Regions:
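Generic recognition of stable, solvent-exposed alpha-helical segments in well-folded globular domains
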Residues: 165, 169, 182, 252-255, ...
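Generic recognition of flexible, low-complexity loop/linker segments
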Residues: 170-173, 246, 369-370
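Catalytic and binding regions of secreted/periplasmic enzymes and modules that target cell-wall glycans
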Residues: 190, 197-325
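Short, functionally critical alpha-helical segments immediately adjacent to catalytic or ligand/cofactor-binding
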Residues: 168-196
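Beta-rich interaction/scaffold domains
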Residues: 331-399
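Cell-wall glycan-active module
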Residues: 1-177, 269-340
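Generic helix-packing signal
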Residues: 178, 264-265, 388
């Protein structure tokens, strides 16, 4: 169970301290609730110096932020290239049914104030390796109940006895490249699923048999490859197998885990994307809004919750440092997740009048028309049909 909150008479002093650090008022209640349970935790504002709406708009570029196809319709975008108005379907942008996220859900997941709870806050935890606080025992807690727990696998003689456990490989890989092994485990579970059923680590892909990609590095849909195939193409060495960076070809799980960890350490953590949040929403450095590890808009929050499982209450009693982004011109309160569902298609497939002519000619994206009729006209009939057969049309008839 969680510890009892700190006495409320500390509240005013702590809020004053947070204000002095530069946290906006809208952050304070969530941070106080966390501090009252975990007084050793340290919260630091990470000032992006980026306008809030600018950042959200940059992440709203088609293809940068995706949601699963079964998400509520209000979570899915209808911008150009995201939705097929003719057949009322969202366009798949990545293998597995991933479609463009709506601006509203992007804003929700980008708003740090929505994730100031004892599990999701771990997306703001610094990702560096710390031998004193990151233990094999806690890693075992994180992976328990998943395919990573107590599992041995054939490493093709990359270790002295030819077998290893996922947990041990993740731990030593993290220690060797300077990244928290807890982060690596959370990433692998997020990318491969808790049951490990992803074809990325099966070794049996039809086009790239015998190759593995433990973190889905370079895995995205192209005209030639599915996302899994593109990731395995990268694992194989890419064009003609010529790529040898990061220990490629990854023809064993051992190589895929260690090589992928080294890739992540060099290209993300060392580049300043040293929290799960910044890995997903890169609002720092010279390559802002690019070099983002995933397109899943909920990825940072999801991995943060997975990461939190590694921290027992005893470990949470120690000092942990969280770097929490602050934007310029943020909304006064946290952006809620949209809740609406149903077809967004309110367009017409036809609009006709019995007398005169519409100006301009009917097109489904035009919302206003002018109608000029002869002076002697007494009545007109308006007829319209919806593009979505399940929709109804109001306002037709005789006038």
């Amino acid at each position: 169970s969680e510890p009892e909150p700190t006495a409320a008479n500390d509240r005013d002093a702590y809020l004053t301290q947070l204000r002095a650090l530069g946290f906006p008022e809208s952050y304070l209640e969530g941070l106080w609730q966390l501090h009252s349970r975990y007084p050793a935790w340290e919260f630091r504002p990470f000032f992006t110096n980026v306008d809030w709406n600018t950042a959200v708009n940059e992440e709203n570029v088609l293809g940068k932020s995706l949601v699963w196809g079964s998400a509520p319709s209000s979570w899915k975008s209808t911008q150009e290239g995201a939705f097929n108005w003719t057949d009322n379907t969202w366009i798949e942008l990545d293998s597995g049914g991933w479609v463009a996220a709506s601006r509203e859900i992007i804003a929700h997941y980008m708003d740090p104030r929505n994730f100031l709870d004892s599990s999701a806050v771990f997306q703001f935890l610094y990702q560096g390796y710390d031998a004193a606080s990151q233990t094999r025992e806690s890693l075992a807690v994180l992976v328990s109940g998943t395919f990573l727990a107590d599992t041995t696998y054939d490493t093709d003689l990359d270790t002295s006895n030819g077998v290893n456990t996922y947990a041990e490989t993740l731990y030593t890989a993290g220690a060797d490249c300077g990244v928290s092994p807890y982060i690596l485990a959370a990433m692998m579970l997020q990318e491969m699923g808790t049951n490990g059923a992803s074809e990325s680590i099966s070794g049996t892909n039809r086009r790239f048999p015998g190759y593995y990609n433990a973190f889905n590095i370079g895995a995205y849909k192209t005209a030639e490859y599915s996302a899994v195939e593109r990731g395995l193409w990268y694992a194989s060495g890419g064009h003609n197998g010529s790529g040898t960076s990061w220990g490629r070809p990854w023809n064993s799980l051992y190589k895929a885990i260690r090589g992928g960890a080294a890739f992540y350490a060099a290209n993300y953590v060392a580049a300043g994307q040293n929290t799960l949040y910044l890995k997903r929403f890169n609002v720092q450095g010279e390559n802002m809004y690019w070099n983002q590890y995933m397109t899943n808009v909920a990825g940072a929050a999801s991995e943060g919750r997975l990461l939190s499982y590694a921290y027992s209450e005893e470990m949470r009693a120690s000092k942990l440092t969280f770097n929490i982004p602050v934007y310029l011109n943020m909304p006064e309160s946290a952006v809620p997740a949209p809740t609406g569902d149903g077809s967004p298609n309110t367009k017409l497939s036809s609009l006709t009048v019995s007398t005169g002519a519409l100006s301009p000619e009917f097109r489904r994206d035009i919302r206003e028309y002018t109608l000029i009729v002869p002076n002697e006209t007494e009545r007109i009939t308006v007829t319209a049909s919806p593009l979505n057969a399940a929709a109804s049309v109001a306002g037709t008839g005789e006038y």
